[in-house]
Amino acid sequence: MSDLINIQQKLLPDVLAVMQKRYQILRSIYFAEPVGRRTLAGMLGMSERVLRGEVEFLKAQGLIDIASSGMTVTKEGLIVFRDLEGIMNQLSGLHSAENRLAELLQIKKCLVVQGDSDITPWVREEMGRVAVKQLDLALVEKRNVVAVMGGSTMATFADTMPSDFAKGRELLFVPGRGGIGEDLDNQANTICDRIATKTGTKHRVLYVPEQLGEEAYQSLMKEPAIQEGLRLVQSANAIVHGIGDALTMAKRRHTSDEVIEKITRLSAVGEAFGYYFNEQGEVVHKVSTFGLQFEDLAKIPHIIVVAGGTSKAKAIKSYMKSAPENTILVTDEGAANMLLNGSKAHLK
């Protein structure tokens, strides 16, 4: 396939340019549907006049439908879109970027989706879909315990989970941490419940505050029910989690002014599992949390991290300096460009 693409680039470059343009239109309609022509033109940076001709072509081919509510992708259009993904990623340089990024971060694998989730929110949905596929490939055992962390990215991951995900496997989804006091929709408990309900699988809850004072923390750790819940979480053979911006996460957790001053003074840029990392990957602060600890990751065979957007690049880089080598990172062009080039330039 790559040889054919190289030949086409030399002999028929215009054909490939048209194919890329129509793929981008189809992709944008799929993630924003139903979407109007004016909105789509703005998303793509294309004039309505030029877009009108392309949309009419896609409709004539049966790839999209046009209604008063907006444009949507047909079943045939979705098949074409999925079939084109690999080719388009190769043409855009994404495959090469993925390999370079994995080498830079010294982890098992990187997968980069087109776009920047800071600018285009539906890019996060695409990252979620890719993460679901990676989890599906990882769960080769008959019985699996999957730990899922909280956060808005993980909530999107849950939304992209297909109803037939179990495929005959016995799956138990467990929250990687407690979450009382956090936004309900983004709590790990809630996300596990949504995934289990959607896929017809099982889940457990960990109804304890995400963070407590040291005395209360040590007291609760002695409770048999808490210990049993933590043992179950620690037995996970796969985990899916995000990476947070340090200050954003601290404020979201209603952290004291004293601690915020500390992590600011010590230049924390990233956060995961209650650990705050500086740009060198050093832990500059840790909060006592109920659930998986960073050191527990060494025992988990399959680790999938989902984080994207230009604004997350420093957080991703800081965390990956300590991440296990078997980590798979699902990110977007926005973060990948900053990590590889230190700029927003397009990946090449």
Model-derived regions, located:
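HTH-adjacent hinge/linker in prokaryotic transcriptional regulators
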Residues: 60-142, 159, 165-166, 184
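Ligand-binding beta-strand-loop-alpha-helix segment within the catalytic cores
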Residues: 99-109, 168-245
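ATP/nucleoside-binding phosphotransfer catalytic cores, i.e., glycine-rich phosphate-binding loops
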Residues: 9-17, 32, 52, 76-77, ...
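Gly/Ser/Thr-rich loops at beta-strand to alpha-helix junctions
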Residues: 47-48, 146-157, 180-181, 244-247, ...
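Basic, Lys/Arg-rich alpha-helical nucleic-acid-recognition elements, primarily the DNA-binding modules
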Residues: 1-87
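Gly/Ser/Thr-rich active-site loops/lids in small-molecule metabolic enzymes
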Residues: 253-282
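Short Gly/Thr/Asp-enriched flexible loops that form oxyanion-binding sites at enzyme active sites
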Residues: 153-165, 251-259
